Regions:
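Cofactor-binding catalytic cores of oxidoreductases
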Residues: 86
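Short, solvent-exposed loop/beta-turn-alpha elements that line the ligand-binding surface or hinge
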Residues: 99
């Protein structure tokens, strides 16, 4: 933590990745008084929330102020609108306020974030297939998703063994 929750400084990923922040929020609150820091981060996330309710993958979102105009250039990996709306990363708007409530009894953060939470849930409902949020058969047809540990394409109806199966 410096001014924002970063991913890993050694790989030039010093953006405020929302997925990393939501995973670490509970631990951060347990290790140190992180209430003010995380509330400030949530305000950044709410300021960056898209009109359709999508939560950005990182916040403050530099693409909001300086859109990446040429996705074919190696230094511009995607159009700015593509960097929002992935589950896990967007869930930060719900998980971080909840962690602040659990650790500090802060009901104010729940009230402050509630409209953004509803917008995020509406966004998820709008991209869902009925009651389930599923990746579609085409990679990225519902917007960009990371799927860091999952195969993004293929027959997802048949479970296949993975290297981590025996770890559970």
């Amino acid at each position: 933590f410096l001014d924002l929750p970063t991913d890993c400084p050694q790989r030039d990923e010093r953006l405020g990745w929302t997925g990393d922040a939501q995973v670490f929020a509970g631990t951060a609150c347990w290790l140190a008084d992180s209430q003010s820091f995380l509330r400030k981060f949530l305000r950044d996330v709410m300021a960056d929330q898209r009109k359709d309710g999508a939560i950005p993958h990182f916040s403050p979102d530099p693409t909001r102020l300086h859109p990446m105009s040429d996705p074919t250039r190696p230094d511009q990996l995607a159009r700015s609108g593509d960097w929002a709306g992935s589950t896990g990363w967007g869930d930060a708007i719900i998980i971080i306020p909840w962690q602040l409530y659990l650790h500090y009894g802060d009901k104010g953060v729940l009230a402050e974030c509630f409209p953004a939470m509803l917008k995020w849930l509406d966004y998820l409902w709008n991209i869902s297939d009925g009651p389930l949020i599923r990746p579609s058969s085409r990679w990225g047809s519902h917007g960009f998703t990371f799927g860091d540990w999952l195969q993004p394409v293929g027959d997802n109806r048949k479970p296949r063994p993975t290297i981590s199966d025996e770890c559970a």
